Amino acid sequence: MKLRFWFAAVLALAVAVAPAEARRRAAPVRVNIIAFNDFHGALEPPRMAMTAPAPGGAEVRVPVGGVAYLASAVRRLRAGNPNSVVVTAGDLISASPLISAEFLDEPTILAMNLIGLDYSAVGNHEFDRGRQELLRMQNGGCERFTSRQPCRLDRFPGARFRILAANVRTENGQTLLPGTGMRTFGTGRRRVRVGFVGLTLRDTSTLVTPTGIAGLRFEDEADTINAAARRLRAQGADAVVVLIHQGLNPRLGYNDHSCAGITGDLLQVLARLDRSVDVVVSGHTHHSYICDYGRIDATRPFLVTSAEKNGAILTNISLSIDPVRHRVTAKSADNVLVQSEAYADRRGEVSLTSLYPAFPRDPAVAALVARYAAVATPIIARPIGRLPGPALKRANDAGESVAGDLIADAFLAATSGPDRGNAVLAFTNQTSVRVDLVPAADGTVTFGQLFEMQPYGNNLVVLTMTGGQIRAALEQQFASGPNTVAHPIMLQPSRGFTYGFDLRQPEGQRIVDMRLNGAPIGDDASYRVTINSFLASGGDSFTAFRQGTNLTGGVQDVDALETYIAAMGATPPPLPPTDRIRRLSPR
């Protein structure tokens, strides 16, 4: 009798426990993905503000960025969930401030090692210094592949995180770097797995110097993602997260979730994605947004996120994953401002605000930055000349900017002598003008400012072109690769060269009235033209420049700009008036 009672008690307990255990096993596992993009080696606070909502419908400018603050923000978000992973969507390095670029972005990689970055997709800028230097970023070492000496402070250990390049194939058909990764969270029957796919935009080959990517093939983004997502699911992934260096252009605030009015090249990729994708972390456009793509296409209810640039924002993505049915049951995301330190700009003081979280500097990361800054600061702070006002990169209706004209004039001055190439005109691409050049109150500009404006380290190239070839290059502003009438890439001309364009005319007939110092450009006449080495290789889809002959090498772009501004003296002349390009068709 007692034995029967004992068995009954055990059975009752088992019956009572079983549902509880089943519920525990079925309860979703929450995974957090902490994401950012387009960091561009912004180790120090970039003197950047994000406009954010304030009470009563007002707005406040919040100072953001700086890797020591970013590290602290990541740590705080991680503390909220041990099941966390940190990712980026490309352009982690290059086009960087001098404190990182002077050292080939080694300090940026080291800072990310300290932060605990897990995965980083390649972006177009990861290829700026060529494939071998990118591999050195991953694998470490001190072998020299550029004009700068690596390992100037310490031997470089390489990235402890994995760089992903799913759509970049080498000559043998293999990916240059791994294309995917998998992270496991939880144990036993509560274990879930999240797969990651990392890739860059297919047009990367048009955005970097061709010689640095010789032999590489950049494949279709959607095809690559879909194939990788299927493989990850077959390997047991319960969720698939895409890290892609391509993006969107939002109309609303940094943390708006509506997708209202959103545009951009990434939309063409999203419309073709496999429905097994759960999250798309994007970049490239330097915007911030969170879009529930299910509002656009109910059959593809994935999140699409982006976090501005320079470590200004972190996207905190939460996934609830069912460990029994092996799928995501809920997802959400928020963009978190990385509030850093106050500064003043032309609009006034940008102060810290209690309306948004503040983050202290991470001491280990701050010490790393200080060590490199001690070496770089004298170079950055060196005054090189004066300007009468700011040279802004913002273009007028014809696509011409003061900054672009200033750089083109510097290129011409550096190469116009008979012993320096005999150039009579020069062009620079508007995409190479990285930032505005804003002098101090007394007009002084520093080498660090010039480097921020021209950070790519391109050499000048002088070549002989016919007037017809020059015309063909200008036509490619509107019709070559990704360059279109809707999204042109404008060449910035040097003084003395003028022309007009009429977008109502058919392709190949839009450029009119080219003149040099008032005289018409003859299609069959020859001219010595200066461009940067990126354009000379056909960069930005300006393949017409490859037709040039009698090439002569020149100084680096930033050195030409330094010499030109230094020669202006204590009383510099007025800045270029942006009257070299005439738009003949209405906007």
Model segments located where?
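Bacterial N-terminal signal peptides
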Residues: W6-A14
